[in-house]
């Protein structure tokens, strides 16, 4: 766990680093997103946010962020398939849905892992959004890492 200002960040460590490197405060991010400072503060305090909010933070600053699930210690994902349809249809959690499908993991099994109902997992994939902590926990349970890359939107 990394101490970042007032927060001990593990899941959202990369968000804290982004803020620190760019001299951003919770107020500055909140103003850019058009939300309350308390919302951003809450995400950092809880070390969790909806995927849509994580993407919004980076997009607001002209950046795109891409996530991938990879085996621990692997630099590039051996499962990475360029141009998979899910990635464009579901830009936020398509990587997660794609992974569980490739591994033959059923949504019922995902729901059981987190102690939620299958309809909750169905909702995530229908609306292409879930809390980032679920993805981190899934990765931990399966011996995976959540990797991310950040680039300019026009790249």
Predicted features and spans:
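Short alpha-helical DNA-recognition segment
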Residues: 23-40, 104-120
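Residues within the helices of the helix-turn-helix
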Residues: 16, 27, 97, 108, ...
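Short amphipathic recognition helices of helix-turn-helix/homeodomain-type DNA-binding modules
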Residues: 68-78, 151-155
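The alpha-helix within a helix-turn-helix
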Residues: 19, 30, 58, 100, ...
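DNA major-groove recognition helix of helix-turn-helix/homeodomain DNA-binding modules
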Residues: 52-67, 132-148
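DNA major-groove recognition helix of helix-turn-helix
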Residues: 44-45, 61, 125
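Residues that mark the N-terminal boundary/hinge immediately upstream of a DNA-recognition element
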Residues: 14, 25, 50-53, 106, ...
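A short, Lys/Arg-rich alpha-helix, primarily the initiator
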Residues: 1-22, 75-103
